[in-house]
Amino acid sequence: MEAFIESFSAGVDAVDGFVWGWALIWLLLGTHLFMTIRTGFIQRKIPTAIKLSVSKNDPYAEGDISQFGALTTALAATIGTGNIVGVATGLLCGGPGAIFWMWLTGVFGIATKYSETYISMKYRVKDANGRMLGGAMYALERGFKHKGLGKLLAVLFALFTAIASFGIGASVQSNSLAGALTSSSLVPGASEIPTWLIGIVVTVLVAIVIIGGLKKVSKVCEKLVPVMAIFYVACCLVIIGMNGAYLWDAIVTIITCAFTGQAAFGGAVGSGIMLALQYGFKRGLFSNESGLGSAPLVAASAISKNPARQALVSMSGTFWDTVVICLITGLMLVTSLLANPDLAAIYNNTMLASNDLSIDTAVGIFSGGAALATACFESIPVLGPLVLVVGLLCFTYSTMLGWSQYGDRAITYLFGTKGIRPYQVVFLLFVFWGCIGGGDLVWNLSDISNALMAVPNCIAVLVLSGVIAKGTKYWIYEGRLEEEDTTPIPTVGTVDHPNV
């Protein structure tokens, strides 16, 4: 039995490496570039998007939650450990140049986030209880001319989303949370705290919110996410300020290494331009989730006059997540390395090892990135350890809340509203399991599902790109953003049966 589990795990590792390889990267990057062109470089509308995200709701528009609530719920799932550890891992494996490519993918990813949200809003439906439902599965089913293919891709997308929510959205996050608590030097006797006790507390805290549904989750995220993001950015800016003399050198280093492939600080190690590209694209693409189709699942519930308004609001999430927060994280890390020769020496030695891509595993590289981020944050006197613990607690908790709603929408599509309560119970079990141990196998399985979400979602965006381009021109470029979309939103299914 043990041999079977080892073989199965090895097979899962191989599949994980394949699906997160260059094929997926080029699919996502190609979609980003294509939709940037099709939408007339929608990125230039970021100021409008930010303004809309904090505007008051139209009392006559249809929807369940505010535009800001939908945005913060999506950000709750994306602003997380990836912004700390993910950027550090990209730096560790691809050199400082990876940060430049990470930032660039965020800029172009804005167009894909806009596009996937637009079709989610355009093809959204209501269930028998009047609850708004949307996402790639409804766009695939309602928007495709070939109904059979559309239905198949829709079911696959929903299935992969549900599976991913149990791993990346639940057990992986709770495992990180429990680890942060038990290893914290701020809590006396932290290492002696039973993980099952932490599991019970965390599970109850998550249950209190998600049992209340999307409205309860969005209300919590509206309060938690802005505070969480501001706190983290402020701490990064403090470190950058402490190393202010190295800020210009850090910017020059990042840009230079992006096109030369130099990886080591003052050394001869060269990761190569392709590694800088690879890890920059990977960490950027998967930090903001543009192209995965996750955020539109919640965005479809927003109160909005027309599809373009909420699509603009959603794309501002990618701007904040990758273009702003990941960039600030990168500058914090690079200035810290330039200011601390001893830390840079450790980084250089790690780079020598990480040039052997065989160690690019969920444990090895992830741990290396975490160690690098930890070392940089500890440069803040007294507050350093507190920043890490509080930040990680907030990030992991909010991620669990956000992903619970993604899975909720996927299960509703597959099984109807009757599947929601059983799903929530299973989700909470995975939260508890993550606290007491979890496992790398769960990470890899959910990682694969997370990656496979992108395939049907990108197909939907590309096939329906004409609809997106036409709608963008009508609502945005012809000045109709304040007008109401009078197209009736269909009601599907019944209370006890699937909505498809």
Residues of each region from the PLM?
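Alpha-helical membrane segments and immediately flanking helix-loop junctions
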Residues: 60-93, 119-143, 156-162, 270-319
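Flexible loop linkers connecting adjacent transmembrane helices
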Residues: 41-67, 89-91, 95-99, 103, ...
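Helix-loop-helix module between adjacent transmembrane segments
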Residues: 31-36, 105-130, 137, 141-175, ...
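Selective recognition of specific alpha-helical transmembrane segments in multi-pass small-molecule
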Residues: 108-116, 199-214, 225-245, 283, ...
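Extracellular/periplasmic helix-exit of transmembrane alpha-helices
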Residues: 116-124, 128, 237-253, 264-268, ...
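N-terminal alpha-helical transmembrane segments of multi-pass membrane transport
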Residues: 1-81, 91-98, 109, 432, ...
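C-terminal membrane-solvent junction of multi-pass transporters and transport-like membrane proteins
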Residues: 145-153, 389-433, 467-500
